[in-house]
Amino acid sequence: ATYLSYLPKEDFRYPLRVNSDSRGKFVEILQTSHSGQFSFFTADPGITRGGHYHHTKNEKFIVLRGKAKFRFYNLLTGETYEIVTDDQFIEAVGTCRGWAHDITNVGNDELIVALWANEIFDPEAPDTIAKPFRDLRLRL
């Protein structure tokens, strides 16, 4: 905190890298060595993001704007679970290891979701394994 108080005013703000594709934007806000990574993403109506699972990573999502459907699929048992939430009821939705998950914008406006992950993404040892729900023959 003392160090930060001596930063020049020009360093009070700084640009963030925006990763954009057809699904929307993904922005990493902050990476920490002990507290994980903080990010947010966007999705237009009808767009699904995710479609993967993790071996070690835990994630928490908060819908800041819009309405989202979270779908989960247990890789061992085949059990499915679904949560629909929106910006009118602020709650955290967590993922669990061994469950594939995706998030769909089921509202009429842009979806904005804040995301915390317990560990920083490591391109040398990625822990995001693609498992699109269309490959699981789900009836969701």
Where is each model-derived feature located?
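C-terminal substrate-binding subdomain of Rossmann-fold SDR/epimerase-dehydratase oxidoreductases
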Residues: 1-25, 135-140
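A short glycine-rich, His/Asp/Glu-containing loop-to-beta-strand
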Residues: 12-51, 57
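Short histidine-centered beta-strand/loop micro-motifs
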Residues: 28-29, 49-55, 62, 83-85, ...
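Intrinsic-disorder/low-complexity, polar/charged segments enriched in Ser/Thr/Lys/Arg/Asp/Glu/Gln
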Residues: 36-38, 48, 67, 80, ...
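Residue-level "contact hotspot" at macromolecular interaction interfaces
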Residues: 42, 62, 92-94
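Glycine- and acidic-residue-biased ligand/ion/polar-headgroup-sensing regions
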Residues: 56-75
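Short acidic-glycine-tyrosine-enriched beta hairpin
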Residues: 74-98, 102-104, 112
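Double-stranded beta-helix
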Residues: 77, 100, 104-140
